[in-house]
């Protein structure tokens, strides 16, 4: 998708990225199980774990450096909380340093 981001920017679009983070792969699996119980589609546990880590790696390694604006939101509880936001040429605002550190650790 990095190519798509660059192509859109080349056509004058401003690209915003909103990353909804869950605080553990376990919670991601629980959310999928809940969805399945309501008739939704399943995703195997190993795929959830792989995508959880890879998604965070891609967030920091590919997308944050190229999108115009980004934000990371903790979607673990009913009330969503902003973790951090920034963008090209903007100062990064960190609202929860502990959560941001935890997210980065999962991506290693």
Whereabouts are the PLM-identified features?
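NTP-dependent small-molecule kinase module
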Residues: 61-108
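A glycine- and Lys/Arg-enriched "phosphate-lid" helix/loop adjacent to the NTP-binding pocket
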Residues: 10-59
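Anion (oxyanion) recognition and catalysis
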Residues: 6-9, 64
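Short amphipathic alpha-helical segments and helix-helix/interface helices
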Residues: 5, 59-60
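Generic structural hydrophobic/aromatic packing signal, biased to beta-strands
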Residues: 8, 15, 70-72
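Short, well-ordered alpha-helical microsegments
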Residues: 1-2
């Amino acid at each position: 998708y990095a190519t798509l981001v660059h192509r859109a920017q080349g056509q004058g679009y401003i690209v915003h990225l909103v990353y909804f983070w869950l605080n553990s792969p376990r919670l991601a699996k629980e959310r999928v199980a809940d969805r399945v119980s309501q008739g939704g589609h399943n995703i195997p546990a190993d795929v959830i774990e792989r995508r959880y880590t890879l998604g965070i790696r891609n967030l920091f390694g590919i997308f944050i450096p190229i999108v115009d604006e980004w934000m990371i939101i903790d979607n673990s509880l009913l009330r969503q909380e902003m973790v951090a936001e920034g963008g090209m040429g903007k100062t990064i605002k960190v609202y929860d340093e502990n959560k941001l550190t935890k997210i980065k650790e999962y991506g290693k």
